[in-house]
Amino acid sequence: MTLRSIVIKSGGHRLDTSLIKKPAEINEYLASLKKETCDFATYVLCSICNSIIQKHQVQSKAKISCRKVLSCPDQSSAGGLGHKNWEPSGALILPSTKQMGAEGSPVKSRSLFCQTNHNHLVNMDPMVSNDNNQQREGEQVGAMVGDSSPEDSPSGKHWNVRKGSGLVDPQTSCIRQILLLQLELIEQQQKHLHNKNKEIEDLKAEKEMLMARIERMEHRLQMVKKDGVVSRPSQTTCHKEPEAETTTSDDVQHSGGRVQTPKQTQRGRGVKGSKGKFLLQDSPTGRSRRGQPRSPPTSQQESPALKEDMQCHSKEVPYLTTTEMYLSHWQTPPSPQRDPSTVHENTVEVPSWRESILEPLGQKEASDILECLDDSVFLKRHSKLELDEKRRKRWDIQRIREQRMFQRLQQRMNRRKVIQESEPELLSFHAEPEDVEYIMVTPFLPVVAFGSPLPNLKQQDFDLPWLDERSRCQPEVTKKRTPRRRCRK
């Protein structure tokens, strides 16, 4: 189908007369235009309808094949009968039922290609009319072919499931978030409980350690009390003895004072340094010092309880201990050579002063002073200074550049070579007073050598670690020596 084109020819001076036409000709021209537009619309709609029908046929065939595969044998026969009753795509059958309006009122039946009202089609936009016609034709063709509704078909069910899953997704995400929060809370509580259990175990261990210490202290106090009860009657008998015996005992005490005097001084130092924070234990030596003069320390008069306590303590402690006091130098004593001696000087040399009296010069007026202030004189006077200043600036710039270059080179060297920090030199084995952690008041002193306690070694035979018992048991095999052969002459 082709559209007609009208060419208006120029009529010269008869333009006005040619434009004016009769009303009958105008009506005929309008009628022909309406017919042409209607024919064009019907052609376009027919082509659109045929394309839609072909698409629906392809879709229906695919659906039927899926149903045949998925349905039972009883349903497949029914589907085949229904397929036979279908009509060809060329013939279009309009529905016999009347179209109803929005409120149930019947609507005038319209033809498939909307040919009832030609004036309405002329006034409407062709693109809008084509879209509306396509939608209506698609619905009618679906009804004519006899396809099931999209909700009844499996694809429709899948679409409904998708819609439902879209609604469920936010709910599942919320539930997941709640579960994650609950899991995090459970993990935090487990960590908190684990830390609390650790603290409880540490406290239990500290409690057991303190209980063991308290038991040891109680045991020592009981032993000391027993020793005190035994020593009191011996002290009363010493009073009744004659004065000669007391003098001999005093002499013995003076002889043994060399060992006991450092004990008194060290005990006094410990009490002074502790500032009343630590309590002194009631030892037998302290009680004898408070009361009457004690008997001379001999091996026969030592109580068996003290020996047992010594043995128990030596077994518990991994280092050697003694009850005898000994002198230990924490620091080297000041020698007389190192003492700074003051230099005594009899005379101090002082420079001699003399007074020189200078009289001021006479005041002269400015007019009397002859000074040349010409430009040439002024420039000569300041040219040397300017040159010196420029030279200094040049030198300063050069020095700054050299310093920057030196710094860059030094940084490169530091990056390549890592400077190893030298460890401080060990000057003495003795610990410094700043490193003291705690003070222990006890009658047993550790045997210290070079600032560290000596280990408590068990009494056993000397053995070499690389010799086994088997090698010891094997007897030594003496090798036979053959006599030397002498050469015969």
From Swiss-Prot:
The keyword Acetylation does not apply. GO terms for biological process: chromatin remodeling. Residues 126-164, 224-311 are annotated as: Disordered. Keywords: Chromatin regulator, Coiled coil, Nucleus. Residues 347-466 form the PEHE domain. GO terms for cellular component: MSL complex; nuclear speck; nucleoplasm; nucleus. Residues 371-389 are annotated as: Interaction with KAT8 HAT domain. Residues 179-227 form a coiled coil. It is found in: Nucleus; Nucleus, Nucleoplasm; Nucleus speckle. A motif (Bipartite nuclear localization signal) lies at residues 380-394. The keyword Nucleus applies. InterPro entries: Msl-1, MSL1_dimer, PEHE_dom. Component of a multisubunit histone acetyltransferase complex (MSL). Interacts (via PEHE domain) with KAT8 (via HAT domain) and MSL3 (via MRG domain); both interactions are direct. Belongs to the msl-1 family. Component of histone acetyltransferase complex. Within MSL complex, promotes ubiquitination of histone H2B. This is Male-specific lethal 1-like 1. It comes from Danio rerio (Zebrafish).
